[in-house]
Amino acid sequence: MKKGFTMIELIFVIVILGILAAVAIPRLAATRDDAEIAKVATNIQTLISDLGAYYTSQGKFATKTSGESTSVDIPAMTNVSNPVKAKTDNCFEVIGPSTTSGALEVTVGTAGLCSKIWELPGLKSVNDSLTTTDNKKYLKFGGIGIDWNK
């Protein structure tokens, strides 16, 4: 007598593997999204922290001049890429310096996973602290604008 699996036993194994795959794959996708949200949230907080530390130590932001325009030199102040993206969506981007001392113009994206990122408690408070003027959002650093050089 030959020993081996019957056709019915093999079909049952295939069905069980299919059920396990149907349950595991959506959970794996959700875990990947959660990991992406955590990574982006950490990058945004690190970017803001690095910019604040640079502004506190130097009293100004690093800038670079290209022709007649001046922009903020993000790579000189942090290793976090600008804009901060969740997959392909921009969640946070530093646009440039504002006319107000110690403030940067920023954009906050809410597409895709970005909407979930801004619901996190730490980043919700950051989003709430942004000031809006003329439909532009600004992130304020430093104190009340005291200039010790005068």
Predicted regions and their residues:
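Periplasmic/extracellular, small/polar-rich flexible segments of pilin-like filament-forming proteins
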Residues: A53-K150
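Helix N-terminus capping/helix-initiation residues
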Residues: T31-D34, A111
